[in-house]
Design a protein with these regions (language model features):
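Glycine-rich phosphate-binding loop and adjoining beta1-alpha1-beta2 segment
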Residues: 40-58
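Conserved Rossmann-fold NAD(P)-dependent oxidoreductase catalytic core, especially the SDR/UDP-sugar
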Residues: 88, 99-156
């Protein structure tokens, strides 16, 4: 019976994965799932995720159990993997935690790794991409060292684009609030550059497909983007349409936005630094997902469909 350790199950994409596991329980009788969660004394930002966990535990046909561990503590992870004898790690929690958990998993014989990282690694700007590149370089080096010792390790890296679908996502949720509150809407260069944000439901379902089609998906890298490229301006317009508001867009030249960011940086003696954020505003972030579509039928929803649920959540929050 394959034993799969999953982190980040209470996050929004993790919740959709868990819902899929419950829905597919008849096909998962040969699996055991260990859901690695933060200790109960640490306040969670995802109460809905923990409620879903409680509901899942009632499902007797699905072989799951919950284990507590602090993903920032290598000693706790070492003790966990020493006791669980896992076959696969599906790490959703955070790319920044990968270097904590992957070495401990490998040390204790976990030979199949699915790591959910980010397309942010492709950014040319240092703060956005350099940390991710360093983490992955160390992981690849460690895996190579184990392979030299004869281990048959299979590692697949998933790279979502900008994720939306939750009011705590810090991305599209910010745009929703801005569109709702600002009738005069400032943009940089008219916001005419391509993004390809991905709905967290599509991610959760993709995680399931990668895990259950492992003979096909092992030792691959997949970009998990949204249905199609969409300009940021079109994102604003779609949000406004679903909110029922109208905005007047004012375009600020890129050079002026950069100048303003520099002024703020100097005036605050470096305490407030928007320089790189302004640069990333005009960095194209649209990526195709052809490999995922070919290997496991990945077919994400268009933005106009995926954003509906988040818009309704926002409306409910305002009431």
């Amino acid at each position: 019976m394959p034993c799969v350790v999953i982190t980040g199950i209470t996050g929004k994409s993790g919740q959709f994965l868990l819902k899929r596991l419950i829905a597919e329980k008849a096909n998962l009788k040969d699996y055991q799932f260990i859901l690695l969660c933060r200790p109960q004394n640490v306040k969670s930002k995802n109460p809905a995720g923990y409620q879903l966990l409680k509901d899942a535990m009632v499902c007797k046909e699905l072989n799951i159990r919950i284990e507590e561990a602090d993903l920032t503590c290598p000693k706790a992870l070492d003790a966990f993997f020493q006791s669980c004898h896992a076959d696969m790690l599906l790490h959703i929690a955070s790319v920044k935690l990968s270097w904590n958990i992957v070495p401990e998993a490998l040390k204790h014989g976990v030979d199949n790794l699915i790591l959910v990282h980010t397309t942010g690694i492709y950014s040319k700007y240092k703060a956005a991409g350099e940390e991710y590149r360093q983490i992955e370089a160390k992981i690849h080096q460690l895996v190579a060292e184990y392979k030299e010792q004869g281990r048959r390790i299979a590692m697949t890296i998933l790279r979502p684009t900008m994720i939306y679908g939750d009011l705590a996502d810090k991305n599209i949720s910010v745009f929703i609030r801005m569109v709702d509150k600002l009738r005069i809407f400032p943009t940089v260069n008219g916001a005419r550059y391509d993004l390809q944000p991905v709905w967290c439901k599509d991610l959760g379902y993709a995680f399931y497909e990668v895990m259950t089609k492992w003979q096909v998906t092992r030792n691959k890298e997949y970009i998990l983007s949204g249905g199609a490229p969409i300009q940021l301006r079109e994102i604003f317009l779609e949000i406004a349409k679903q909110l029922g508001v109208k905005n007047t867009f004012i375009s600020c030249p890129f050079w002026l936005a950069c100048f303003g960011a520099w002024c703020i940086y100097l005036a605050t003696l470096g305490k407030i630094d928007f320089r790189e954020k302004v640069q990333r505003l005009v960095e194209p972030r649209a990526y195709g997902h052809e490999a995922a579509a070919k290997d496991f039928g990945y077919a994400p929803a268009p933005f106009a469909i995926g954003i509906r649920e988040e818009i309704e959540m926002y409306k409910a929050e305002k009431r």
